[in-house]
Design a protein with these regions (language model features):
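Short intrinsically disordered terminal tails
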Residues: 1-17, 84, 126-132
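Generic detector of low-complexity/intrinsically disordered segments
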Residues: 14, 36-37, 96, 114, ...
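Acidic, low-complexity, intrinsically disordered interaction modules
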Residues: 41, 47-119, 124
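Intrinsic-disorder/low-complexity peptide segments enriched for small residues
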Residues: 10, 32-33, 110, 116, ...
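Short terminal alpha-helical segments
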Residues: 7-43
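Compositionally biased, intrinsically disordered low-complexity regions
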Residues: 16, 21-24, 32, 66-70, ...
Length: 132
């Protein structure tokens, strides 16, 4: 018997169906940029994970960008070592902000969720620096 209360991971195509053409195009561009960050700074395995779970990773990436826009202290250079307490803080924050069934995607990949969040902060920072 199927559990009707259980949600599933949303596909990006489903999200884009309810968006106008411009927003849909922006989502495609941002997902492409997110994957470039993962490919640039991370392992092939993690890149493939993010490709497989685009919508979930896109959500975490976007959360990083929004966090940076609200407080630029969230930014950490993805090439630099990270304070373990900061990493734990972000992982705890993500796990409490994302619904449990969606967060389950990252069980065993919590550090990747943290890094995708950081890539989101870095993405917005690069955009801001490019505009100045």
């Amino acid at each position: 018997m199927e559990d009707n209360n259980k949600t599933r991971e949303v596909e990006l195509d489903e999200i884009k169906e309810v968006c106008d053409e411009q927003t849909s195009s922006m989502i495609d561009e941002t997902v492409s940029d997110m994957l470039k960050f993962v490919q640039r700074y991370d392992s092939k395995e993690n890149y493939e994970f993010c490709q497989k779970h685009e919508a979930t990773c896109f959500g975490v990436f976007t959360m990083g960008g929004v966090a940076y826009q609200n407080d630029n202290r969230f930014w950490v250079n993805p090439k630099e070592p990270v304070d373990p307490d900061y990493k734990e803080y972000i992982i705890d924050m993500l796990s409490s902000m994302i619904s449990q069934d969606i967060w389950n995607t990252f069980i065993g990949h919590e550090e990747l969720a943290f890094r995708v969040f950081l890539y989101g902060t870095h993405y917005i920072r690069e955009e801001e620096l490019g505009r100045s």
